[in-house]
A protein has these predicted regions:
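C-terminal and inter-domain tail/linker signature
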Residues: 1-121
């Protein structure tokens, strides 16, 4: 586990929640991949389209980290109400190279093969 991977993901959440799109882009690789069960898109343009249209705030909770993969349990607030979800990030050289939304923590952990042993903190 490295502190920089966690710090990158926390800063990414802050930028998303504050709609600070310049910082969101600066924390993401040029070819960042953004996806969920419906599909994926790549690049800063796709990231910005998703961030501007999502209308969500995602407050990070428990974090799991191993080999550049960070899974974050999230408390999500949107126009539809409050829920929980999880996102799986790949972080390389302090940049998010991919982020995939999952409906729950269990599916994010299964997709990344992380376990309770990888719980940060």
């Amino acid at each position: 586990m490295t502190t920089s991977e966690i710090a990158t993901v926390l800063a990414w959440h802050d930028a998303l929640n504050e709609q600070d799109f310049d910082t969101l882009v600066s924390l993401s690789s040029d070819d960042v991949e953004v996806g969920d069960a419906k599909g994926a898109a790549q690049g800063h343009t796709a990231l910005l389209e998703w961030a501007r249209s999502s209308g969500v705030k995602a407050e990070p909770g428990r974090m799991y980290v191993r080999d550049g993969i960070v899974v974050v349990e999230e408390a999500v607030t949107s126009a539809a109400g409050n829920s929980t979800a999880a996102s799986a990030f790949r972080v390389v050289h302090d940049h998010v190279t991919s982020v995939f939304r999952h409906p729950d923590l269990a599916s994010a952990l299964a997709a990344t093969e992380l376990t309770e042993k990888d719980l940060a903190g």
